[in-house]
Amino acid sequence: MMKELIKEIITDPMKLKIPCRPIGKLQNNALLDEIVMYLTDTYKANQKRCLGLAANQIGYQKRVILVRITQGFVIMINPVIVPSLIHGRITKKENCLSFPGQVFRVKRYKRIKVIYHPYTKEPVLQTHKYTGLAARIGQHEVDHLNGVLR
């Protein structure tokens, strides 16, 4: 049985405010493989209280996130969010592993399009549309990558 690769969640706001750098090489990248392994195992260890996770929450200043979706979760490399302005925004309560016990009221777009590279053998740029909770999670995690704390 393989050992779980779980990292401690970063709670220092000064570390979380640093914008993350893009992943350059998408294939045969040992650092990317390491980030994804730790991100996945750390998420699974916290999934009862976690809907997504950004690489900088576990100590990597790289643009990689994990977002829970209906069918499990998706790893997004270098994600870019394009909001659907026509559908507007909504304010809801959110919490965050990096700020245990705190609840924030955050206004987010109801629908978004995310452009990203998947973590696959053929990391071809993909575009997916998300609504509702998945859209909110995606925006929350990309905020982490941008050093935005709410």
PLM regions and their residue ranges:
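Positively charged
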Residues: 1-150
